[in-house]
Amino acid sequence: MFEHYSVLKEESIKGLAIKPDGIYVDCTTGGGGHSLEIASRLNENGQLFAFDQDKDALAAARDRLSTYADRIVFVQSNFRGLEEQLKKHGIEQVDGILFDLGVSSPQLDRGDRGFSYNHDALLDMRMDQSQHLSAYEVVNEWSYERLVSIFFSYGEEKFSKQIARKIEAYREQQDIKTTHQLVEIIKDAIPAPARRKGGHPAKRIFQALRIAVNDELEVFNNALHQAARLIAVNGRIAVITFHSLEDRICKQAFKKWSTDKPTPRHLPIVPESHQAPFKLVTRKPITADTSELDENRRSRSAKLRVIEKVSEWDHEFTYEEGWRK
C-alpha cells in the first residue's frame, strides 16, 4: 500500500491560506496527504489539480481522496508540464500552488525502485517509469568526469573523484546492476575514518544519482517560474525542500521576486511600476517542530518557504539558471 507521511502538513496548508472556492495545485501529490487537507477545505466551487508522475502514487491518492472526487482533477505528469496541463483544462490562473519535493517514503521504504541504499534492488531511481534514463545507465555509461561533476554538484560529496574512479574500475570488469553493489563500491572508495561519521556513506551519491536521473533541479527551477506566472494576485506558492540545492533555488527566486526594482534616491516613494509583485510570507524557512521530528525523522531536513503575489507585473518570470551561482 502506498502510505506516505506528509511533512509540515499543517504549516504548508496554513501558508496557502486556502479559499473555499479557489483553484489549487498540488504539484507532488504522493500519497495524497497534503491534497486531502486542501480538498477538505474546498466547497463545490473549489478545485484541486493533483499532479504526480508516479502512477502508483496517483492511484493510491485517487483511492484516498475518493470522498472529494467531485473537486479534484488527477494529472499524471511531471510538474515541468504545469502550465501545459492546466491550459488543457482551461485554467490560466490559480490561487495556490504547493511543491513538496524529494522522494516519497514508500519509494524509499519499498526498496524495489532503487532509491534506497538500505535495500538491495536493481539500479533504477526513475520517478517516471516510462523514461529511458535510469541510475543503471548513469553509473555504467557516463564518463568519469561527468560522474565527478554530478557527485560534487548534486551530492556535495568531497570524495567524488575517488568514488567515480572506483566505479570506473569496477565497471571495466562487470556491470554495476544493483544498489548493494554500488554501496560496497562507495564504501571501498571512502577512507575508513570518514565512513564512521556524517551518516550513511552512500547517502550523498544516491541523492546525486536521483537528481541526475530525474533532472530534478532543472525541472523544479523551470516549474517554479511557471508557478509565478500562473499564480493569481493574493495567491500563494508554498515550497517544501529537503536539501540545500533545492532550497537555494527557492530562496533566490523568492528573494528576487519580492525585491523592488532599483529607483532613483530622490523619489519619496517607490513607484508602482517598480514595486515587487510578490511579498515573502515566511522571512525565514519554517522547519518541523519537535513533535513532528519524533514522529518522522525524515522531517529534520525539511524547510517550508511561502510567497504571496500582491500585484501583476511586467516581469515575464522566465526560466533562469541563476541558482547555479
Curated annotation (Swiss-Prot):
Family affiliation: Belongs to the methyltransferase superfamily. RsmH family.
Function text: Specifically methylates the N4 position of cytidine in position 1402 (C1402) of 16S rRNA.
Annotated protein name in UniProt: Ribosomal RNA small subunit methyltransferase H
Species whose genome carries this gene: Oceanobacillus iheyensis (strain DSM 14371 / CIP 107618 / JCM 11309 / KCTC 3954 / HTE831)
Cellular localisation: Cytoplasm
Lineage: Bacteria, Bacillati, Bacillota, Bacilli, Bacillales
Predominant cellular place of this UniProt entry's protein: cytoplasm
GO cellular component terms attached to this protein's record: cytoplasm
Record has rRNA processing as a keyword: yes
Residues annotated as signal peptide: none
